[in-house]
Amino acid sequence: MEKFQIYLELDGSQQHNFLYPLLFREYIYALAQDHGLNRSTISLENGGYDNKSSSLSGKRLITLLYQQIHLSISANDSNPNQFIGHNNNLYSQMILEGFAVIVEIPFSLQLVSFLEGKEMAKSQNFQSIHSIFPFFEDNFSHLNYVLDVLIPHPIRPEILVQTFRYWVKDASSLHLLRFFLHEYFNWNSLITPKKSISGFSTSNPRFFLFLYNSHVYEYEFLFFFLRNQSSHLRLTSSGVLLERIHFYGKVDYFVEVFANGFQDILWLYKDLFMHYVRYQGKAILASKDTPLLMNKWKYYFVNLWQWHFHVWSQPVRAHINHLHKDSINFLGYLSSRRRNPLVVRSQMLENAYLIDNAMKKFETAVPIIPMVESLTKARFCNPLGNPISKPIWADSSDSHIIDRFVRICRNLSHYHSGSSKKKSLYRIKYILRVSCVKSLVRKHKSTVRVFLKRLGSEFFQDFLTEEEHVLSLIFSRASFTWRRLYRGRVWYLDIICINDLVNHDKF
């Protein structure tokens, strides 16, 4: 990031967030082709990239774009989007990629200033997805209720333009953003890219993520402000603060008026034990309070989205779960708090009394039904969970078929290694093993018994992870000890995500 900082510094006219002139900068298109501001593989001093990335080409692209739009409008074409609508259009695609880099500059400058003079801790497991579960076990074990909210997405592109207006005051950039959104945009396909009609979300994932995160950040900004100030403000009186233009000036004025005339109607509405987590288009709000208060927060979210962001949302999109009775689906796990407390025996000093401490255990189990549904969509089994063959892989070699099954099985084993109950994971691994055997049997036109007899027991050893294989050799003679150890919860913190079974269209 430091090597690009000199290129991100704006001149006098751009210090007011005038980003439109950056479209004519050569390095913007070089950064767009590199698909990242923090990669070290690109050298801006090297002029090795082709002529498409030059500043003169950028000017020509914009000129040709507007000329074609003018010709389409003047000719009164029945399909005015024929120039913009094609995914393979070079002009609009390159400008949009460059614009995606430009709109990130204000946020990148804030990140650089924030990290200036600070040394980041280097750790291989710093971004591990499993670092979230210790947070759940430490903080959610003493909570009672969880509000599971499905974050709605805006159906009007103009809402995103208004959100972006809070960060950038450049009218030209706002008009260009509005143009791209109205020509390309199909927001219903952003959350589910498989149902995409236009090529916006699939061909421009970087721009999509920026718009979605900026939209979610706005509602979270208001939520955190009102949540922190809820002990001083009435919920019905805080509507004047929702507009972000001159936000802090309105806050100062409102606090002054509130201190003079509304001190007698304070409404205590603050929860010190509340935790908020957002992931994959959903949000979790956990609290120790009563269901009545959680129900108030539920309708608060609905009213905030409908009346301020003009986004349609229904109360049924938010579910209140009791951690003692219900489970929450979080990142591929079914998490819940165990009813029976876990007793931990401790001893402070030698020859002292033994103390039994009752602790509430937070369990994370593998959701068997969603996993079987995923395997069914990928055609590894039928809806009942019975393994079937994979005929689409019949043209591959035997080693390639086995490697693909083993890779999926190992990834699932690593990802769900920390589950408190392994029985569901054993069922999933069994489906993949038998599906692999049936795929090979169908390819060679043989039977399962004959095929397994020819391969031997070494065939199933490939499905074991490296950790399982080592432990099975160590505890091969002590089956009880090995079985008890394998049932324990072991997190493999180098696993970031499952990249095989998430996208079903790969199979």
UniProtKB/Swiss-Prot annotation:
Keyword terms of this UniProt record: Chloroplast, mRNA processing, Plastid, RNA-binding, tRNA processing
RNA-binding in keyword set: yes
KW Glycoprotein (keyword) present: no
Single GO biological process annotation from the record: RNA splicing
Subcellular location: Plastid, Chloroplast
Single GO molecular function: RNA binding
Main location: plastid
Any Pfam family hit: Intron_maturas2
Gene Ontology CC terms, in alphabetical order: chloroplast
Functional summary from the UniProt entry: Usually encoded in the trnK tRNA gene intron. Probably assists in splicing its own and other chloroplast group II introns.
Family statement drawn from the similarity comment of this UniProt entry: Belongs to the intron maturase 2 family. MatK subfamily.
Name of the protein: Maturase K
Organism annotation: Cupaniopsis anacardioides
Lineage: Eukaryota, Viridiplantae, Streptophyta, Embryophyta, Tracheophyta
